[in-house]
């Protein structure tokens, strides 16, 4: 494994199209493996660009101030409030307890795992995404799942920082490392990286928790709105 800690090299790595999140293998439609293989997060190249454009368009429809108010007025623990507020902002149905549980199950298996309950969770969620396009439905689930744990961690950190979300983001960012895999042999700075080599990027101390370059998180402002709203409504 190659570990990269210098900001310049991390930014170069995040902009390198040959360093990608570990690609998903895929599976039958409606399974957890299929979801991983269908979201923008684990895609690369033209497929990633197309899926990311859809995600960006979905997020662009959401008003940050309205989302903040939704988060302030929604009941439940932090993850439940995040999921229900964001779903409402996306014009999805009200999430009942079963839907929230399903999203939490998917979140727990998003980066790997073979829990059969995750397949059932994906199948429960797909009809709630209000689209007949399976790829769009998968990426709507992805938006919800990717907002869940990281934003909840940011809220928890902000509570420890007297409610200051921006201070928490600087002092204790919810994402400390990012992982990449070289799909071909490549180079970052003076470091040669072999094909298939795993790469660990220590982004947390450098203020790069939302990434950099073509894969920078498109939901940064909405994550902050969710966190601030949740803290207002505590």
What feature does the model see in each segment?
Residues 205-234:
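Cytochrome P450 heme-thiolate "Cys pocket" and heme-binding signature region
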Residues 77, 142-145, 149, 214-225:
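Short, conserved micro-motifs enriched in small and acidic residues
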Residues 73-123:
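Flexible, acidic/His-enriched mid-domain "rim/lid" segments that flank
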Residues 9-13, 165, 231:
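A generic structural signal for short hydrophobic patches within well-formed alpha-helices
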Residues 82-83, 102-107, 120-166, 227:
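Central I-helix of cytochrome P450 enzymes
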Residues 128-132, 162-197, 201-204:
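Conserved cytochrome P450 K-helix E-x-x-R motif and the immediately C-terminal K′/meander segment
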Residues 6-9, 51, 150-155, 222-230:
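Catalytic-loop motifs flanking and including active-site residues across diverse enzymes
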Residues 1-94:
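Active-site substrate-recognition loop segments, prototypically the cytochrome P450 B′-helix/B-C loop
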């Amino acid at each position: 494994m190659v570990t990269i800690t210098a900001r310049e090299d991390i930014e170069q790595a995040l902009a390198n199209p040959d360093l990608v999140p570990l690609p998903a293998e895929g599976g039958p439609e409606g399974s957890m493996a299929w979801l991983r293989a269908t979201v923008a997060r684990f895609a690369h190249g033209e497929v990633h660009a197309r899926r990311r454009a859809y995600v960006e368009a979905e997020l662009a429809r959401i008003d940050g101030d309205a989302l903040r108010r939704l988060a302030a007025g929604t009941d439940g623990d932090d993850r439940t409030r995040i999921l229900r507020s964001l779903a409402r902002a996306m014009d999805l149905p009200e999430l009942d307890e079963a839907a929230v549980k399903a999203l939490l199950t998917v979140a727990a298996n998003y980066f790997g795992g073979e829990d059969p309950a995750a397949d059932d969770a994906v199948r429960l969620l797909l009809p709630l995404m209000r689209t007949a396009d399976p790829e769009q439905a998968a990426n709507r689930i992805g938006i919800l799942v990717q907002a869940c744990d990281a934003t909840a961690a940011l809220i928890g950190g902000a509570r420890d920082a007297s409610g200051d979300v921006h201070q928490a983001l600087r002092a204790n960012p919810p994402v400390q490392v990012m992982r990449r895999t070289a799909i071909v042999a490549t180079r970052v700075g003076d470091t040669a990286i072999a094909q298939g080599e795993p790469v660990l990027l220590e982004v947390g101390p450098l203020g790069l928790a939302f990434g950099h370059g073509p894969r920078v998180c498109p939901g940064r402002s909405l994550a902050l709105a969710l966190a601030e709203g949740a803290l207002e409504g505590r």
